[in-house]
């Protein structure tokens, strides 16, 4: 499969993902409320995983979590580090959860987007934090959908871009498979 990025178009991260900020979880909480639910913070080691906690505890504490596959991005520390969590996770205050719409979310699409987002990591080097406004307005280049006649498909609702481009989710999935 050819990877011709010259035809890719720019999309704001906020138009592709729903972004959720984490809330403070301590190591003590993880130890005292042990479980099977993955806790992600800002480190790169172990894919950002800090430990495992009881999922019900996370719900009671109103922590930010996803039961479905998602990406996480470190806000500080290893700022900009993106990890894929196939079984969902809860994030502490040093991380964010990035979710795709259910109809397009697949492990393969998440893996593709993880790689694309990781290419932007340099923007958060030298102590620059991943702030919400900065990350929401960050742009990534993605393959776009085409009509049968070879012209770019344009979405009148402009859900993903102000120009009407639509990411080619199927292409991303096939590329990873």
Q: Where do the language-model regions lie?
A:
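Non-catalytic DNA-recognition/assembly elements of restriction-modification systems
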Residues: 1-24, 31-48, 150-177
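A structural detector for beta-sheet-dominated domains
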Residues: 6, 14, 74, 101, ...
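General detector of folded, globular domains
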Residues: 6-13, 39-40, 70-72, 83-84, ...
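Intrinsically disordered, low-complexity regulatory regions enriched in Ser/Pro/Gly/Thr
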Residues: 31-32, 65, 131-133
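Short, flexible loop/turn elements at secondary-structure junctions
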Residues: 41-44, 77, 102, 144
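A short beta-sheet element
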Residues: 51-118
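Extended intrinsically disordered, low-complexity coil regions enriched in Ser, Thr, Gly, Ala
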Residues: 59, 110, 130-132, 170-177
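Glycine-anchored helix-breaking recognition loops at helix->coil/strand junctions
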Residues: 94-95, 113-159
